[in-house]
Amino acid sequence: MEANKSMVKLVAFLIILVSSCFQSLTAQDLEIEVSDGLNVLQVHDVSQSFCPGVTKESWPELLGTPAKFAKQIIQKENPKLTNVETLLNGSAFTEDLRCNRVRLFVNLLDIVVQTPKVG
């Protein structure tokens, strides 16, 4: 009986792991081109920004990339974003607006699976 419980837990873990792999593959299939790694992308019209001094509010090009890499890109593009946090996709989080925060929603492999946004 003990062995069956362990086997069920192992199978459940493997299902979660495999499903998170497929989620990251679909994000990588978007054909987003990141040339040499740490290129800075600029937004020319900052009048639409809801946060003063923030020049870019979202990074769709970071879908499918490792969280550590995404954090480096975001902080290089805008040093005012001092709070770049990583959350497992589906985790609970507060919905308050903070102009210094970007949340990276990742899968179990630490791959970004949602577009990172300021807030």
Curated annotation (Swiss-Prot):
PROSITE patterns: POTATO_INHIBITOR. Residues 28-48 form a propeptide. Residues 1-27 form the signal peptide. The record marks 95-96 as: Reactive bond. Transmembrane segments: none annotated. One of its GO terms (cellular component) is extracellular region. It is found in: Secreted. This is Ethylene-responsive proteinase inhibitor 1. It comes from Solanum lycopersicum.
